[in-house]
């Protein structure tokens, strides 16, 4: 294993945002959108040094002339060429490190296809010549970050949500439930319901505007029906938002109708339980003896759990499903947007973790399948 003085890199490749930095730090150094943009138009200015692709914030700032693509959908990498561009950008432009000098810890969603992590492993060793690497499960890292070894994590990002029960540090794979409903679906739904108001958002660039509206103004209602009544009778819930061209739009009940989808997936035509019921179902798949500990340690993680009011609503919904005397505690750490990364930073800097890395030598001997043996 590499010498102790070389900091490991921690890269949490989310469907929406990539969080990257150095093990031992308390926050990621680089947070940028997991976007690759390609020009929609013909370049006419000679000598401008136009690129054929842009990554992250640069793609975001030039979005008016680009087609934006997300290479990670529902937590699974669907475009490896673009993914390589994102990693290249992470190492060389954001962190400014030589990847062949640092071990790298990557993250992935539970219940991902095996081929996905094999390919990640292969690219790290063959394209970037990493000396060592490891792939960790996102939700497990969030629990590390909250300082617990037992609990159930509801991790909801941009592309995928999942509930992962963990007991004394062991994830219980039979009880993990994956829900392909997350931030991006909420953004799409917000685009749809704003269209009903007469505001048209259609392009990939406009989707980013709607995502911003969602992040700034949406919240979870404690009682949806009652909130709808309030919205009808008073304008107290209305907020205005200024679009990049200076036009001001007003949004009212969309503010809480959008995230309500998390609790009522039928809003977007999904036949699935909401996040509260999924969490409950996940707990019920666990041994009867450990359920009490899970109810009392329900940890929220990921950007889509950042809506104001979500913890209170979860508390209310799970209380109505659980046995009446059960103590239920929803833990919503303020830094939960980055708790996967923070957990990775903690894990990669533990002395006991150093023998867990997959080294280049092991990879050369066994090939990409080594990742299933060495990583949970």
Curated annotation (Swiss-Prot):
One cellular component (GO) term of this entry: cytoplasm
InterPro entries (alphabetical): Actin, Actin/actin-like_CS, Actin_CS, ATPase_NBD
Recorded catalytic activity of this chain's protein: ATP + H2O = ADP + phosphate + H(+)
E.C. numbers: 3.6.4.-
A family per Pfam: Actin
PROSITE patterns for the chain: ACTINS_1, ACTINS_2, ACTINS_ACT_LIKE
Family matches, as CDD domains: ASKHA_NBD_actin
Family, as annotated: Belongs to the actin family.
Function of the molecule: Actins are highly conserved proteins that are involved in various types of cell motility and are ubiquitously expressed in all eukaryotic cells.
Protein name: Actin-3
Organism encoding this protein: Podocoryna carnea (Hydrozoan)
Gene: ACT3
């Amino acid at each position: 294993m590499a010498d102790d003085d070389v900091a490991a890199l921690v890269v949490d490749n989310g469907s929406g945002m990539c969080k990257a930095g150095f093990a031992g730090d308390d926050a990621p150094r680089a947070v940028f959108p997991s976007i690759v943009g390609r020009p929609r138009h013909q370049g006419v200015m000679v000598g401008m040094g136009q690129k054929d692709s842009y990554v992250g914030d640069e793609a975001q700032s030039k979005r008016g002339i680009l087609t934006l693509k997300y290479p990670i959908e529902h937590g699974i990498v669907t475009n490896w060429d673009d993914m390589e561009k994102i990693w290249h950008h992470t190492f060389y432009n954001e962190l400014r490190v030589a990847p062949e000098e640092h071990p790298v810890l990557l993250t992935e969603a539970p219940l991902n296809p095996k081929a996905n992590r094999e390919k990640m492993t292969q690219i790290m060793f063959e394209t970037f010549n990493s000396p060592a690497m490891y792939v960790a499960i996102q939700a497990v890292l969030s629990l590390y970050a909250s300082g617990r070894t037992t609990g159930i994590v509801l991790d909801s990002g941009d592309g995928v949500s999942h509930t992962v029960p963990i007991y004394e540090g062991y994830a219980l794979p039979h009880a993990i439930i994956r829900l392909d409903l997350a931030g991006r679906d909420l953004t799409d739904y917000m685009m749809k319901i704003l269209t009903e108001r007469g505001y048209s958002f259609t392009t990939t660039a406009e989707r980013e505007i709607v995502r911003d509206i969602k992040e700034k103004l949406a919240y979870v209602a404690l009682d949806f029906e009652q909130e709808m009544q309030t919205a009808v009778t008073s304008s107290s819930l209305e907020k205005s938002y200024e679009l990049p061209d200076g036009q001001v739009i007003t949004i009212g009940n969309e503010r809480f109708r959008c995230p309500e989808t998390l609790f009522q997936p039928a809003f977007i035509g999904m036949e699935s339980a909401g996040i509260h019921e999924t969490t409950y179902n996940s707990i019920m798949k666990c041994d009867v003896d450990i359920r009490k500990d899970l109810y009392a340690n329900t940890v929220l993680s990921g950007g889509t759990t950042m809506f104001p009011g979500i913890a209170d609503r979860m508390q209310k919904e799970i209380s109505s499903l659980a046995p009446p005397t059960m103590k239920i505690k929803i833990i919503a750490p303020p830094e939960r947007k980055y708790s996967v990364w923070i957990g990775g930073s903690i894990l990669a800097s533990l002395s006991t973790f150093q023998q867990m890395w997959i080294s280049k030598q092991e990879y050369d001997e066994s090939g990409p399948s080594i990742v299933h043996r060495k990583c949970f």
